[in-house]
Amino acid sequence: MLLGDLRRTHYSKDIEPEMDGDEVTVMGWVHEIRDLGGIIFVLLRDRDGLIQITAPSKKIEKDLFKSIRKLKKESVVAFGGTVQESGKAPGGFEIIPSFLKVLNISKQPLPLDPTEKVKAEIDTRLDARFLDLRKPSVSAIFKIKSRMLHSVRVFLEEQGFLEINTPKLVASATEGGTELFPITYFEREAFLGQSPQLYKQIMMSTGLDRVYEIAPIFRAEEHDTLRHLNEVISIDIEASFVDHEDVMKILENLVVRVIEDVNEHCTDALETLGRTLEVPETPFERLEYDEAVEMVNSKGVPMKHGEDLPRAAEKALGEIMDGYYFITSWPTAIKPFYVMPDEDDPERSHAFDLMYRDLEISSGAMRVHQHDLLVEKIKRQGLNPDSFESYLSAFEYGMPPHAGWGLGAERFNMTLTGLKNIRETVLFPRDRRRLTP
């Protein structure tokens, strides 16, 4: 049925017990129905919560009572009625209905249970994601994610950053390697962008010396774990006339701001998830790479200097370290060509990772801004400088010193929500096995 002139007057969060006697119109989905014979209770769900519709047969019209009795779970309805204070109902109030309009009837049986009384496996949930997202515990994840992204934008704008949009159709790899999705671009081969890194650095040559981007990146990596996806949202910044220490401070202050904002604006969502977020103190603890290797070995996990952190090493660190912390001074040999080596010890670099317990959520570095050194490093990694011609040209005409980082939005949201599976932080995740819905 169509709405006609009917419109919602209140969401669930807008109604309070003090509104006893007020007339309201509410709209949403039939979450649950309890028919006790002479009285029917309907839990109506909207984006903000649940509203109890209480229908006593002796107090409402006979035809209305019959219509309520016929309702099916997850049908879309509009109720009008009178607010009545009730200590037993959600939010301390109930609505005694005066009319019902059924806007759409849901097919039965349901592929999964939005009340969560019957649990479903992750694949079942993702196959029927539109229903899964109706669960309060699932919608809470994305309310927090939305606030996090909003907070990031506000914070970076306050710090003088300009939002940019870089190409997602690219001619070559950002860092070499094979983690690329090839596509046909007219008569040529192109790829989905795996990182905005090179474009961020090119922007440093334009005079727009503080930029950020929040956008999808695509990586055809082999990993099929609870922490990896093939399409994610990356929060990237780049800034000129700064070094790695400066952008690390920006990153830790951003994390603090986000947590403060989520605590302030997402109290209901956090309560739904059973989460209590402590605001971390700054500066975050810093471990040099060499220290991290020693700590990993002390936990009985073999790791050699010069290796990237394997999963076992991350787990070992997570048992020692709590909260957010940086790993700094990574070996130059295992970092990308654009990472600046330490002038006093070229075997070490000005690169860092931000960790949350055993989870890497961000990587960044001071960048190489000298053209000749950059060409040398590209060659040293077995890559052809000719493949980076348009990138390198920006370094020949006045490139300032610069630094930056990329922060994984989904992994960051895992730290806020306490989720263990990154797929749960994406509306419609893409991994090696899933391309729909």
Swiss-Prot record:
Give residues annotated as binding Mg(2+) 3.
E360
Source domain of life is Archaea
Cellular-component GO terms for this entry: aminoacyl-tRNA synthetase multienzyme complex; cytosol
- One example of a Gene Ontology biological process annotation: aspartyl-tRNA aminoacylation
Q: Tell me the cofactors it needs.
A: Mg(2+)
Residues involved in ATP binding: R219, A220, E221, R227, H228, L229, E360, G408, A409, E410, R411
Query: Which sites bind L-aspartate?
Result: E175, R219, S363, R367
Reported EC number(s) for this entry are: 6.1.1.23
Quote the function comment for this protein: Aspartyl-tRNA synthetase with relaxed tRNA specificity since it is able to aspartylate not only its cognate tRNA(Asp) but also tRNA(Asn). Reaction proceeds in two steps: L-aspartate is first activated by ATP to form Asp-AMP and then transferred to the acceptor end of tRNA(Asp/Asn).
Family, per entry: Belongs to the class-II aminoacyl-tRNA synthetase family. Type 2 subfamily.
Q: Which PANTHER family match?
A: ASPARTATE--TRNA LIGASE, CYTOPLASMIC, ASPARTYL-TRNA SYNTHETASE
NCBIfam families, A to Z: aspS_nondisc, PRK05159.1
Entry protein name: Aspartate--tRNA(Asp/Asn) ligase
This protein's species is Methanothermobacter thermautotrophicus (strain ATCC 29096 / DSM 1053 / JCM 10044 / NBRC 100330 / Delta H) (Methanobacterium thermoautotrophicum)
Name the lineage: Archaea, Methanobacteriati, Methanobacteriota, Methanomada group, Methanobacteria
Gene that encodes it: aspS
